[in-house]
Amino acid sequence: MTRHSRPIIAVVPAAGVGSRMQADKPKQYLTLLGKTLLEHTLEVLLSYTPIQQIILAVAENDPYLDQLDVIRQPKIKIVQGGRDRAGSVFNGLKAITQPHAWVMVHDAARPCLTHEDLDKLLQIEDDNGGILAIPAVDTIKRASAEKQIIQTEDRSQLWQAQTPQFFRADLLYRALQQAFEHGLAVTDEASAMEFAGFRPHLVAGRSDNLKVTRPEDLKLAEFYLSRK
């Protein structure tokens, strides 16, 4: 199957609470420029023609979801999220019915994604898959439990992982299964694929594809979105 004929599915884990935001609701439902973060994110994916379906994994009895008109788009399928991000992604993968599908896993709170970056990911064809990432630009320190510097890392080989992360759906499903069986802490999909023996490609992304994690990130995301 060529890259032009393979089904492309997006999985968006959106069941988290975002405790570091110190907000009165999960961060994906915070509002920027009249829309929630989740709406901004979904609209980018919906408007990208190669994506055939978006699987949205949300918390059970989510009280905010039905307030969003965008979730009624026919491309969007809702599934129940898991206990953590990896569990939500796993549930999303289980809902994929298309054979030979490739999956783009994207954070609900990364609203500034561009189609140009998605185009670059779609160039990947081998089973290693790949992720958007940016080279580390700040000096990186390794710390002790007491928050004292142990050493300075060589940043020339360090990259900061972003999303989407793009893999064959069946391979990612098996990689997550294997990671769960071994009790691996899966912080992103690439870590599960690495554990399974793959070497995902690093695709240079953009610094404005930020994940809204802390209160100060909201203003920065608003600035980037206002310039689109």
Swiss-Prot record:
Residues marked Transition state stabilizer (site): 20, 27
SUPFAM superfamilies the UniProt entry points to: Nucleotide-diphospho-sugar transferases
A Pfam family it matches: IspD
Cytoplasm keyword on record: no
Pathway(s) this gene product operates in, as recorded in its UniProt entry: Isoprenoid biosynthesis; isopentenyl diphosphate biosynthesis via DXP pathway; isopentenyl diphosphate from 1-deoxy-D-xylulose 5-phosphate: step 2/6
Site feature (Positions MEP for the nucleophilic attack) residues: 155, 211
InterPro entries the UniProt entry points to: IspD (IPR001228), IspD/TarI (IPR034683), IspD/TarI_cytidylyltransf_bact (IPR050088), ISPD_synthase_CS (IPR018294), Nucleotide-diphossugar_trans (IPR029044)
Transmembrane segments: none
Any one biological process term the GO annotation gives: isopentenyl diphosphate biosynthetic process, methylerythritol 4-phosphate pathway
GO terms of molecular function: 2-C-methyl-D-erythritol 4-phosphate cytidylyltransferase activity
Keyword terms of this UniProt record: Isoprene biosynthesis, Nucleotidyltransferase, Transferase
Catalytic reaction(s) noted: 2-C-methyl-D-erythritol 4-phosphate + CTP + H(+) = 4-CDP-2-C-methyl-D-erythritol + diphosphate
EC number, UniProt record: 2.7.7.60
Record function comment: Catalyzes the formation of 4-diphosphocytidyl-2-C-methyl-D-erythritol from CTP and 2-C-methyl-D-erythritol 4-phosphate (MEP).
UniProt family annotation: Belongs to the IspD/TarI cytidylyltransferase family. IspD subfamily.
PANTHER family: 2-C-METHYL-D-ERYTHRITOL 4-PHOSPHATE CYTIDYLYLTRANSFERASE, CHLOROPLASTIC
Protein name: 2-C-methyl-D-erythritol 4-phosphate cytidylyltransferase
Organism encoding this protein: Mannheimia succiniciproducens (strain KCTC 0769BP / MBEL55E)
Organism ancestry: Bacteria, Pseudomonadati, Pseudomonadota, Gammaproteobacteria, Pasteurellales
